[in-house]
Regions:
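Short, structured beta-strand/loop micro-motifs enriched in basic residues and often containing a Trp
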Residues: 62-70
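Extracytoplasmic
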Residues: 19, 46-48, 60, 80, ...
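SH3/SH3-like beta-barrel fold
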Residues: 49-54
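Transmembrane alpha-helical segments that form the functional core of multipass membrane systems
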Residues: 117-225, 236-246
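Hydrophobic secretory-pathway targeting helix
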Residues: 1-11
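Structural detector for short beta-strands of small beta-barrel domains
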Residues: 14-45, 85
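Extended, hydrophilic extramembrane loops/domains of integral membrane proteins
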Residues: 71-110
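Generic detector of multi-pass transmembrane helix bundles and their immediately adjacent loops
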Residues: 200-335
Length: 341
Protein backbone atom coordinates (compact mmCIF):
# COMPACT_ATOMS: atom_id res chain seq x y z
CA UNK A 1 0.00 0.00 0.00
CA UNK A 2 1.48 3.42 -0.93
CA UNK A 3 2.56 5.71 1.90
CA UNK A 4 -0.09 8.14 3.09
CA UNK A 5 0.79 11.83 2.99
CA UNK A 6 1.78 13.20 6.39
CA UNK A 7 0.88 16.83 5.69
CA UNK A 8 -2.35 18.56 4.96
CA UNK A 9 -3.00 21.66 2.90
CA UNK A 10 -4.44 24.75 4.53
CA UNK A 11 -8.17 24.46 4.69
CA UNK A 12 -11.13 26.08 6.31
CA UNK A 13 -12.85 22.72 6.77
CA UNK A 14 -13.28 21.25 10.24
CA UNK A 15 -10.53 19.01 11.55
CA UNK A 16 -10.87 15.79 13.51
CA UNK A 17 -8.06 14.30 15.61
CA UNK A 18 -7.67 10.68 16.63
CA UNK A 19 -4.85 8.77 18.28
CA UNK A 20 -3.55 5.48 16.95
CA UNK A 21 -0.76 3.04 17.71
CA UNK A 22 2.08 2.83 15.19
CA UNK A 23 5.29 0.84 14.81
CA UNK A 24 8.53 2.46 13.65
CA UNK A 25 9.96 0.80 10.54
CA UNK A 26 13.00 2.99 9.92
CA UNK A 27 14.58 6.21 11.15
CA UNK A 28 16.26 8.63 8.75
CA UNK A 29 19.43 10.56 9.49
CA UNK A 30 18.76 13.76 11.43
CA UNK A 31 19.34 17.17 9.85
CA UNK A 32 19.63 20.49 11.67
CA UNK A 33 16.34 22.41 11.76
CA UNK A 34 17.67 25.85 10.82
CA UNK A 35 14.22 27.45 10.90
CA UNK A 36 13.67 26.47 14.54
CA UNK A 37 17.20 27.55 15.45
CA UNK A 38 16.79 31.00 13.92
CA UNK A 39 13.29 31.61 15.29
CA UNK A 40 13.57 30.44 18.93
CA UNK A 41 17.24 29.53 19.30
CA UNK A 42 16.54 25.85 19.93
CA UNK A 43 18.97 23.29 18.54
CA UNK A 44 16.92 20.56 16.88
CA UNK A 45 17.67 17.69 14.55
CA UNK A 46 14.74 16.68 12.36
CA UNK A 47 14.38 12.99 11.59
CA UNK A 48 12.05 11.50 9.03
CA UNK A 49 10.59 8.39 10.62
CA UNK A 50 8.77 5.72 8.64
CA UNK A 51 5.87 4.41 10.73
CA UNK A 52 3.31 1.68 10.07
CA UNK A 53 -0.12 2.63 11.43
CA UNK A 54 -1.57 -0.34 13.35
CA UNK A 55 -5.11 0.91 13.95
CA UNK A 56 -7.62 3.62 13.10
CA UNK A 57 -8.50 5.19 9.77
CA UNK A 58 -4.97 4.78 8.39
CA UNK A 59 -4.54 1.18 9.55
CA UNK A 60 -2.06 -0.63 7.31
CA UNK A 61 -0.63 2.57 5.83
CA UNK A 62 3.03 3.53 6.07
CA UNK A 63 3.55 7.22 6.80
CA UNK A 64 6.65 9.41 6.81
CA UNK A 65 6.55 11.43 10.02
CA UNK A 66 8.91 14.26 11.03
CA UNK A 67 10.39 13.82 14.51
CA UNK A 68 12.27 16.65 16.24
CA UNK A 69 15.15 15.75 18.59
CA UNK A 70 16.04 18.90 20.53
CA UNK A 71 18.62 19.86 23.15
CA UNK A 72 15.85 19.59 25.76
CA UNK A 73 15.11 15.91 26.60
CA UNK A 74 11.66 16.84 27.94
CA UNK A 75 10.35 17.21 24.40
CA UNK A 76 12.22 14.32 22.78
CA UNK A 77 10.75 11.00 21.65
CA UNK A 78 13.74 8.84 20.75
CA UNK A 79 12.71 5.98 18.49
CA UNK A 80 14.33 3.09 16.65
CA UNK A 81 13.00 0.37 14.34
CA UNK A 82 10.45 -1.69 16.27
CA UNK A 83 9.50 1.04 18.74
CA UNK A 84 5.75 1.40 19.17
CA UNK A 85 4.46 4.96 19.42
CA UNK A 86 1.19 6.86 19.75
CA UNK A 87 0.37 8.81 16.60
CA UNK A 88 -1.76 11.95 16.39
CA UNK A 89 -3.79 11.73 13.17
CA UNK A 90 -5.56 14.96 12.16
CA UNK A 91 -8.07 14.61 9.33
CA UNK A 92 -9.55 17.71 7.68
CA UNK A 93 -12.87 17.56 5.88
CA UNK A 94 -12.91 13.77 5.97
CA UNK A 95 -9.99 13.52 3.52
CA UNK A 96 -8.15 10.59 5.13
CA UNK A 97 -5.48 10.47 2.42
CA UNK A 98 -4.35 13.99 3.39
CA UNK A 99 -4.19 13.40 7.12
CA UNK A 100 -1.48 15.10 9.15
CA UNK A 101 0.39 12.54 11.25
CA UNK A 102 2.73 13.28 14.16
CA UNK A 103 4.34 11.21 16.89
CA UNK A 104 2.57 12.14 20.13
CA UNK A 105 4.22 9.83 22.66
CA UNK A 106 5.57 6.39 23.41
CA UNK A 107 3.13 3.46 23.50
CA UNK A 108 3.42 2.65 27.21
CA UNK A 109 0.21 0.64 27.66
CA UNK A 110 1.80 -2.82 27.11
CA UNK A 111 4.43 -2.28 29.83
CA UNK A 112 1.80 -0.99 32.24
CA UNK A 113 -0.46 -3.91 31.34
CA UNK A 114 2.23 -6.46 32.20
CA UNK A 115 2.96 -4.69 35.48
CA UNK A 116 -0.75 -4.72 36.34
CA UNK A 117 -0.98 -8.42 35.48
CA UNK A 118 1.94 -9.27 37.80
CA UNK A 119 0.31 -7.23 40.56
CA UNK A 120 -3.04 -8.99 40.15
CA UNK A 121 -1.45 -12.44 40.10
CA UNK A 122 0.60 -11.69 43.22
CA UNK A 123 -2.50 -10.37 44.97
CA UNK A 124 -4.54 -13.46 44.13
CA UNK A 125 -1.77 -16.00 44.82
CA UNK A 126 -0.74 -14.60 48.20
CA UNK A 127 -4.06 -13.10 49.23
CA UNK A 128 -6.32 -15.96 48.21
CA UNK A 129 -10.04 -15.40 48.48
CA UNK A 130 -9.59 -12.33 50.65
CA UNK A 131 -7.16 -10.93 48.09
CA UNK A 132 -9.80 -11.22 45.38
CA UNK A 133 -12.30 -9.45 47.62
CA UNK A 134 -9.77 -6.68 48.25
CA UNK A 135 -9.30 -6.24 44.51
CA UNK A 136 -13.06 -5.88 44.08
CA UNK A 137 -13.10 -3.23 46.81
CA UNK A 138 -10.21 -1.43 45.11
CA UNK A 139 -12.04 -1.49 41.79
CA UNK A 140 -15.13 0.01 43.41
CA UNK A 141 -13.02 2.80 44.94
CA UNK A 142 -11.46 3.58 41.56
CA UNK A 143 -14.90 3.64 39.92
CA UNK A 144 -16.21 6.00 42.61
CA UNK A 145 -13.42 8.44 41.84
CA UNK A 146 -13.66 8.10 38.06
CA UNK A 147 -17.45 8.10 37.68
CA UNK A 148 -18.63 10.10 40.70
CA UNK A 149 -15.95 12.49 41.98
CA UNK A 150 -14.67 13.72 38.62
CA UNK A 151 -18.05 14.26 36.87
CA UNK A 152 -19.68 15.89 39.91
CA UNK A 153 -16.68 18.17 40.45
CA UNK A 154 -16.73 19.30 36.83
CA UNK A 155 -20.46 19.98 37.16
CA UNK A 156 -19.93 22.49 39.97
CA UNK A 157 -20.27 20.39 43.12
CA UNK A 158 -17.87 21.06 46.00
CA UNK A 159 -15.00 18.58 45.47
CA UNK A 160 -14.33 18.30 49.22
CA UNK A 161 -17.91 17.35 50.06
CA UNK A 162 -17.98 14.82 47.23
CA UNK A 163 -14.61 13.43 48.34
CA UNK A 164 -15.84 12.96 51.91
CA UNK A 165 -18.83 11.00 50.64
CA UNK A 166 -16.62 8.88 48.40
CA UNK A 167 -14.16 8.22 51.22
CA UNK A 168 -16.97 7.03 53.48
CA UNK A 169 -18.46 4.85 50.74
CA UNK A 170 -15.04 3.43 49.93
CA UNK A 171 -14.37 2.70 53.60
CA UNK A 172 -17.68 0.87 54.06
CA UNK A 173 -17.18 -1.14 50.86
CA UNK A 174 -13.58 -2.07 51.66
CA UNK A 175 -14.34 -3.08 55.24
CA UNK A 176 -17.28 -5.19 54.10
CA UNK A 177 -15.19 -7.12 51.59
CA UNK A 178 -12.22 -7.49 53.96
CA UNK A 179 -13.95 -8.20 57.28
CA UNK A 180 -17.56 -8.98 56.35
CA UNK A 181 -20.49 -8.06 58.57
CA UNK A 182 -18.84 -8.06 61.99
CA UNK A 183 -18.04 -5.92 64.99
CA UNK A 184 -14.48 -5.69 63.72
CA UNK A 185 -15.66 -4.21 60.41
CA UNK A 186 -17.98 -1.77 62.21
CA UNK A 187 -15.16 -0.61 64.50
CA UNK A 188 -12.84 -0.14 61.51
CA UNK A 189 -15.51 1.82 59.62
CA UNK A 190 -16.14 4.12 62.59
CA UNK A 191 -12.41 4.65 63.04
CA UNK A 192 -12.00 5.46 59.36
CA UNK A 193 -14.92 7.90 59.44
CA UNK A 194 -13.37 9.73 62.40
CA UNK A 195 -9.99 9.89 60.68
CA UNK A 196 -11.48 11.13 57.41
CA UNK A 197 -13.50 13.84 59.15
CA UNK A 198 -10.47 15.03 61.13
CA UNK A 199 -8.27 15.08 58.01
CA UNK A 200 -10.97 16.93 56.06
CA UNK A 201 -11.47 19.58 58.74
CA UNK A 202 -7.70 20.03 59.16
CA UNK A 203 -7.24 20.40 55.41
CA UNK A 204 -10.04 22.96 55.12
CA UNK A 205 -8.74 25.00 58.05
CA UNK A 206 -5.16 25.18 56.80
CA UNK A 207 -6.35 26.06 53.29
CA UNK A 208 -8.48 28.89 54.70
CA UNK A 209 -5.99 30.34 57.20
CA UNK A 210 -2.69 29.84 55.30
CA UNK A 211 -4.25 30.60 52.74
CA UNK A 212 -3.63 28.09 49.95
CA UNK A 213 -5.00 28.67 46.45
CA UNK A 214 -4.94 25.10 45.16
CA UNK A 215 -3.25 26.43 42.02
CA UNK A 216 0.35 25.58 42.89
CA UNK A 217 0.55 22.58 40.56
CA UNK A 218 0.95 22.88 36.81
CA UNK A 219 -2.08 20.65 36.25
CA UNK A 220 -4.33 22.92 38.33
CA UNK A 221 -3.09 25.96 36.42
CA UNK A 222 -3.85 24.27 33.10
CA UNK A 223 -7.33 23.39 34.36
CA UNK A 224 -7.82 26.98 35.53
CA UNK A 225 -6.82 28.25 32.10
CA UNK A 226 -9.37 26.03 30.40
CA UNK A 227 -13.09 26.70 30.18
CA UNK A 228 -13.96 23.73 32.41
CA UNK A 229 -13.95 25.44 35.82
CA UNK A 230 -13.34 29.15 36.47
CA UNK A 231 -14.28 29.64 40.15
CA UNK A 232 -11.22 30.11 42.42
CA UNK A 233 -13.07 28.46 45.33
CA UNK A 234 -13.27 25.26 43.32
CA UNK A 235 -9.51 24.80 43.40
CA UNK A 236 -9.17 25.16 47.16
CA UNK A 237 -11.89 22.52 47.49
CA UNK A 238 -10.10 20.34 44.95
CA UNK A 239 -6.89 20.65 46.96
CA UNK A 240 -8.67 19.58 50.15
CA UNK A 241 -10.26 16.66 48.30
CA UNK A 242 -6.84 15.57 47.08
CA UNK A 243 -5.45 15.71 50.61
CA UNK A 244 -8.33 13.59 51.87
CA UNK A 245 -8.14 10.90 49.20
CA UNK A 246 -4.35 10.78 49.53
CA UNK A 247 -4.67 9.98 53.23
CA UNK A 248 -7.62 7.58 52.97
CA UNK A 249 -5.50 4.48 52.32
CA UNK A 250 -3.33 4.75 55.42
CA UNK A 251 -6.29 5.80 57.57
CA UNK A 252 -8.15 2.62 56.56
CA UNK A 253 -4.97 0.61 57.11
CA UNK A 254 -4.62 1.87 60.68
CA UNK A 255 -8.32 1.37 61.42
CA UNK A 256 -8.32 -2.23 60.17
CA UNK A 257 -5.04 -3.10 61.92
CA UNK A 258 -6.23 -1.83 65.30
CA UNK A 259 -9.69 -3.41 64.97
CA UNK A 260 -8.17 -6.76 63.95
CA UNK A 261 -5.67 -6.72 66.83
CA UNK A 262 -8.32 -5.90 69.43
CA UNK A 263 -10.63 -8.55 67.96
CA UNK A 264 -7.94 -11.22 68.34
CA UNK A 265 -7.20 -10.14 71.91
CA UNK A 266 -10.90 -10.38 72.76
CA UNK A 267 -11.01 -13.98 71.48
CA UNK A 268 -8.28 -15.16 73.85
CA UNK A 269 -10.37 -14.73 76.96
CA UNK A 270 -12.76 -12.45 78.77
CA UNK A 271 -11.51 -8.89 78.69
CA UNK A 272 -13.14 -5.79 80.07
CA UNK A 273 -13.81 -2.78 77.87
CA UNK A 274 -11.01 -0.88 79.62
CA UNK A 275 -8.51 -3.67 78.91
CA UNK A 276 -9.52 -3.88 75.26
CA UNK A 277 -9.32 -0.10 74.97
CA UNK A 278 -5.82 -0.11 76.45
CA UNK A 279 -4.75 -2.89 74.07
CA UNK A 280 -6.10 -0.93 71.12
CA UNK A 281 -4.26 2.21 72.23
CA UNK A 282 -0.99 0.29 72.58
CA UNK A 283 -1.35 -1.20 69.10
CA UNK A 284 -2.32 2.20 67.72
CA UNK A 285 0.78 3.85 69.19
CA UNK A 286 3.00 1.25 67.55
CA UNK A 287 1.28 1.61 64.19
CA UNK A 288 1.10 5.40 64.38
CA UNK A 289 4.83 5.92 63.95
CA UNK A 290 5.28 3.64 60.96
CA UNK A 291 2.12 4.77 59.18
CA UNK A 292 2.95 8.45 59.69
CA UNK A 293 6.37 7.74 58.21
CA UNK A 294 4.67 5.99 55.30
CA UNK A 295 2.46 8.98 54.54
CA UNK A 296 5.17 11.63 54.99
CA UNK A 297 7.71 9.67 52.93
CA UNK A 298 5.14 9.09 50.17
CA UNK A 299 4.63 12.85 49.82
CA UNK A 300 8.40 13.42 50.09
CA UNK A 301 9.15 10.87 47.38
CA UNK A 302 6.69 12.46 44.97
CA UNK A 303 8.19 15.89 45.66
CA UNK A 304 11.91 15.05 45.28
CA UNK A 305 12.39 17.20 42.14
CA UNK A 306 10.72 20.07 44.00
CA UNK A 307 13.00 19.58 47.02
CA UNK A 308 16.10 19.68 44.83
CA UNK A 309 14.80 22.77 43.06
CA UNK A 310 14.15 24.73 46.24
CA UNK A 311 17.09 23.51 48.34
CA UNK A 312 18.98 26.79 47.82
CA UNK A 313 16.05 29.10 48.63
CA UNK A 314 16.17 31.01 51.97
CA UNK A 315 14.08 29.27 54.64
CA UNK A 316 11.77 32.25 55.22
CA UNK A 317 10.74 32.31 51.59
CA UNK A 318 10.79 28.51 51.31
CA UNK A 319 8.23 27.78 54.03
CA UNK A 320 5.84 30.40 52.65
CA UNK A 321 5.88 29.26 49.03
CA UNK A 322 2.40 28.13 47.96
CA UNK A 323 3.78 24.95 46.41
CA UNK A 324 5.81 23.96 49.48
CA UNK A 325 3.06 24.91 51.94
CA UNK A 326 0.62 22.80 49.95
CA UNK A 327 2.83 19.70 50.17
CA UNK A 328 3.45 20.21 53.89
CA UNK A 329 -0.24 20.78 54.60
CA UNK A 330 -1.19 17.65 52.65
CA UNK A 331 1.22 15.47 54.61
CA UNK A 332 0.36 16.89 58.04
CA UNK A 333 -3.42 16.91 57.52
CA UNK A 334 -3.37 13.27 56.48
CA UNK A 335 -1.09 12.36 59.39
CA UNK A 336 -3.41 14.14 61.85
CA UNK A 337 -6.36 12.14 60.56
CA UNK A 338 -4.27 8.98 60.88
CA UNK A 339 -3.27 9.72 64.49
CA UNK A 340 -6.88 10.37 65.55
CA UNK A 341 -8.34 7.35 63.74
Amino acid sequence: MPPAQSSVAASTKSSEEEFAVGRVLSVGKGTLNKELLSSVGMVSNRQIVSVEVLEGKLKGCTVAVPNEITDNPVFNINVKPGTEVILSVVTTGGEVAKSEVNIADYHRAPALGWLLLVFLLAFVIFGGKKGVKSLVALLISVCLIAFVLLPLSLNGFNPLMVAIGICLASAVTTMYFVAGLSKKALAAILGTICGVIVAGVAAQLVIFYAPLTGLSSEEAQILRGSVLVASPKFYSGLLAAGMLIGALGVIMDVAVSIASAVSEVAKIGHRTFAELYESGMNVGRDIMGTMTNTLILAYTGSALPLLLLISQIPSTKLVNLDLVATEVASAISGSLGLVLT
